[in-house]
Amino acid sequence: MEMLKAEVKPAVGCTEPVALALACAKAKELLGEEIVENRMLVSPSIYKNGMCVGIPGTERLGLKIAAALGIVGGHSENGLSVLETLTKEEVKIAEDYMDNTPLSITPADTREKVFIEVVLKGKNHIAKVRIRTKHDNFTFLEKDGEVLLDNEPKVSASNDAAEKAESLMDTVTIQELIKNVEEIDFKDIEFLLDGVKMNEEMAEYGLKQKTGIGVGYGIKKSIEEGLLGNDVINYAMMLTAGASDARMAGVKMPVMSSNGSGNHGLTAILPIVAYNKKFPQSDERLAKALAISHLVTGYIKNYTGRLSAVCGCGVAASTGATAGISWLMNGTEKQIEGAIENMIADLSGMICDGAKAGCALKLSSAASAAIQSAIIAKQDCFVPPLNGIVGSSVEQSIQNLGRVSDKGMSITDEIILNVMNDMNKVD
């Protein structure tokens, strides 16, 4: 329950630039005066994911406008919804601020996945803020040399071990997670249904008109024209892509996130919603399927890292969704584990080249694979042990996926960032 409440929460805007906006808002609040100098360091993963994505309330893209919005009108007490209350006037002021004020945002020399440091200087004061391990986790606050908060994690030189050290996922099995969910009182997880409403509303926005690159809208039109069938897989693709189209375009609406990511939330929730629309279940069963999805997503992220070179929607959140769907299908233990391993065998190589409009394509593929993996597992069709990176147990398969995603693709992540930098010429 503690993990669900900590990792499933509303967010407005792509989580990486929102995290920078949150840090900037906090630093400005600490400073308490006009800013004359700024310096921002972000981990390469934050830098990559914030480079090309739309920001709610403005047509501009990227980290600089997110930082400006946080400085001008952000309220840190709103957490990952820090940009939700900005007025049109504040957005215009932030855009002018960005145009007329040098904003220093550079990649930090760190292997941590989630690291943000903001230093703001005024005429009389200086404020420093750090966020580490999680997008809304303030670990260090300082004003004029006085340390107000020091909760810095110990992070190894090679990975984000601080985040992993917090997790209980190393000691439980997938079946233990599922059994725990089955025993939870419905009232304790009823809040998960709020995510259904939020994420469906974002999907509806992206399906009403061509938003972003219009992946969801294109699937919807193709279903209406008879080019695609109105089956559960295409419906899941349409819903999930439509929501991502809108979110990546910067539509100012909240979504329910999962494990620090709004797109993870879309992928962990909407394929299950699509299955539930076609094959209705009780609210209690739907909530428990969502709980399984979020927890399996977190289980996988424990090994792959919160941010990595692989698409977390493709390898983690969609795998959580397939587990939830398989459970809704009354799958046996073997079938649920088989659905998970089908996903690992399918989408494990999908790269993450930052948050952007094209994410809708990846979420569409992830939603399709999630439904497909659960459907064929229900027919006892799954990848056998010791086949590729699929191990002798589902837990070993997930650990193998983590090794490939974290250690195996660290150089890939560097190259992706270099390629994006060369094209975008971001300072």
UniProtKB/Swiss-Prot annotation:
InterPro entries, per database record: Ser_deHydtase-like_asu, UPF0597
Any Pfam family the entry gives: SDH_alpha
Superkingdom as given in the UniProt entry: Bacteria
Entry's Gene Ontology molecular function annotations: L-cysteine desulfhydrase activity
Intrachain disulfide bonds: none
Alphabetical GO biological process terms: L-cysteine catabolic process to pyruvate
Sequence similarity: Belongs to the UPF0597 family.
Protein name per Swiss-Prot or TrEMBL: UPF0597 protein CD630_32320
Organism: Clostridioides difficile (strain 630) (Peptoclostridium difficile)
